């Protein structure tokens, strides 16, 4: 994975083959069989979509544990999940837990993943000055059977019209949650409009490297650090 010292990934979306893990750019097994997670294609014999969240959580926690030993050295962990993207495949321990069908179960498993990562930070005493961001790249997909979820009291896109893959706000407005005890007051809310492209400038602002970047770098990225700190929009 370009730009990362180490990585544990799948080559594409979970519904796109080849179905194998890549650890530091090398497959953990060869794709010798055919499996179908929406699209039939070459797969590792041991690879199962239902296990991905468990495996990504394990690798993330091992990374946090290892980095914690290098005291005083900052680290960056990017953990893009296969949930709640299609295929909707909650692990067996979560099936039937939500009462909202497979999608609700998948969301519960997603919550579990986040909780496990937070536990790893806690046991390594890294909570206070570690920024944790939880967000998404688009709104809920119609594959989740949104009308059925709404009837049961769950609005995956809140009150916004639309969903993933259309032009309406339900497809574009997403959660953006931050935990950073040393800097961000718990329970605060900002009305500032931001975009995931703003993460580049914001993180650069936090680590203080703004003067080292070329003038033409990240021209579409704007720091929202003032909003995180409870200050007025500084743009």
Model segments located where?
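A long, amphipathic alpha-helix that forms part
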Residues: 51-68, 92-130
